[in-house]
């Protein structure tokens, strides 16, 4: 069991199984953005986006990224109180995929 009335940092897929159903008021997520770039990507203002080349942000394809997202979002749904809040940050590379899964 995880202690209550505290802010917990960590991997939700490792920590959430220790948390009872419908017991969390707020979840703040900063998930991987899936930013492995095979070519140059620019923002609308033409500045270059730097990709991420670290293991925690590597996925085989969009399906594996979506599956990973479904796993942690399912756990969020399980532990959030009925009137709880979910705050997910992202970039325009991933936030719409996460939004679709949330719907």
Where are these regions (language model features)?
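S-adenosyl-L-methionine-dependent nucleic acid methyltransferase catalytic domains
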Residues: 1-103
